[in-house]
């Protein structure tokens, strides 16, 4: 099962993510934040709130309670 072991804020809406399958990459959440109408996602437009996350339950969880599945986060990795 895919999970996130570690995550570090990079810049803007980007987070460096370390997966248990060995992949390390930069996930860019800017398009999601700008295009999703869900209130919890829209709150992350505040960059200070975006920076407030932790790795819990094998994924990234923001202080407003929002989280995404590790598989979705992996799809956000810059190629």
Name the predicted role of every residue range.
Residues 1-79:
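Motif-centric detector for short Cys/His coordination patterns
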């Amino acid at each position: 099962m895919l999970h996130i072991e570690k995550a570090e804020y990079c810049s803007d809406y980007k987070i460096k993510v370390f997966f248990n399958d060995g992949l390390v990459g930069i996930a860019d959440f800017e398009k999601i934040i700008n295009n999703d109408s869900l209130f919890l996602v829209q709150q992350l437009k505040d960059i200070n709130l975006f920076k407030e996350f932790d790795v819990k339950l094998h994924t990234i969880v923001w202080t407003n309670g929002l989280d995404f599945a590790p598989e979705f986060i992996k799809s956000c990795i810059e190629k």
